């Protein structure tokens, strides 16, 4: 008989994710580490564009195999905390579920929890990976999502314009002492301190699988002309009504200013409560798409740069880039 776990939040298409309580019995705890079994060396993974609708790019895909099954189309999600796949893909991977959880976001949705013996993303191979299984689709046009934090044993260079994910080993003195100690946590969301419109301070989620950016109702305020009539937001766990913000929203992060084309005002109180901090917004894929993100989960830092700045040295030889923003990993 399945055991029910604490509610989980998954940030996928403005859905929040995360597992907070351990499961009884022999199953590893929610923060158990997946084992990296491929050599600890540089990798360059090719990403493919994800178009759930013909004219709207909403993320990037990695191709992966779970337990040696058929290749799966997995959306790379910096807001997810573990792999989530739909019913159709489940039949080909042979995972047995030992517990249940709730994926909660705009609504809630039950999921079964199992463990994959192997997960292969090109030449990169892991074992003992936590997987959430849901009935129906996770996202139309894909088999599921894969968390960016799965690769957190490496320094990550996520080049969205070039559609490449670079995995860079840390220096030897920082290299794990033995293969058995190499692992990646699967509960890390990218939360960065930000100032919105020059006055509202808080934390912002960087979510490569969100189809648009969002701000809290508190930040959006209620002046007439700033919010358009309500629009329905569909997501994996349900739907909600948000308001399209008609005025520009400026996100300032570590000296870098990002101005998304589309921003929706939503109730982000659940996200704030479950992250344990004041979340004022979400930067989705369309806003992040022009940039290169360099992410160190180990040092809790992220750098957001335009491709041009990557090759522009300062006069004194230093790299011409904004300072990295500290990550509040939750």
Which sequence ranges carry the predicted segments?
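Bacterial N-terminal signal peptides that target proteins for export
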Residues: 1-9
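Pepsin/retropepsin-fold aspartyl endopeptidases
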Residues: 12-13, 18-330
């Amino acid at each position: 008989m399945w055991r029910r776990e604490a509610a989980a939040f998954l940030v996928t298409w403005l859905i929040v994710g995360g597992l907070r309580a351990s499961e009884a019995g022999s199953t590893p705890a929610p923060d158990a580490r997946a084992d990296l079994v491929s050599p600890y060396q540089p990798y360059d993974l090719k990403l493919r564009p994800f178009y759930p609708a013909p004219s709207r790019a909403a993320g990037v895909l990695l191709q992966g195999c779970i337990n040696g099954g058929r290749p799966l189309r997995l959306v790379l999600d910096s807001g997810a905390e573990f792999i989530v796949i739909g019913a159709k893909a489940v039949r080909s991977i042979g995972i047995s579920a030992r517990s249940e959880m709730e994926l909660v976001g705009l609504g809630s949705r039950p999921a079964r929890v199992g463990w994959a013996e192997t997960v292969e993303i090109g030449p990169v191979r892991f074992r003992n990976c936590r997987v959430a299984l849901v009935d129906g689709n996770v996202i139309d046009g894909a088999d599921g999502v894969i968390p960016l934090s799965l690769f957190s044993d490496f320094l990550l260079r996520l080049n969205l314009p070039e559609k490449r994910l670079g995995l860079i080993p840390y220096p030897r003195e920082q290299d794990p002492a033995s293969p058995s100690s190499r692992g990646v946590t699967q509960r890390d969301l990218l939360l960065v301190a930000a100032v919105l419109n020059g006055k509202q301070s808080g934390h912002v989620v960087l979510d490569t699988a969100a189809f648009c950016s969002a701000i809290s109702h508190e930040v959006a305020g209620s002046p007439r002309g700033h919010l358009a009539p309500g629009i329905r937001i569909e997501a994996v766990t349900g739907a909600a009504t948000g308001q399209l913000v008609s005025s520009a929203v400026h996100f300032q992060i570590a000296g870098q200013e990002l101005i998304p084309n589309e921003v929706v005002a939503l109730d982000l109180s659940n996200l704030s409560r479950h992250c344990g901090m004041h979340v004022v917004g979400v930067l989705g894929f369309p806003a992040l798409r022009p940039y290169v993100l360099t992410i160190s989960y180990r040092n809790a830092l992220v750098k957001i740069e335009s491709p041009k700045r990557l090759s522009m040295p300062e006069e004194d030889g230093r790299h011409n880039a904004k300072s990295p923003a500290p990550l509040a990993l939750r």
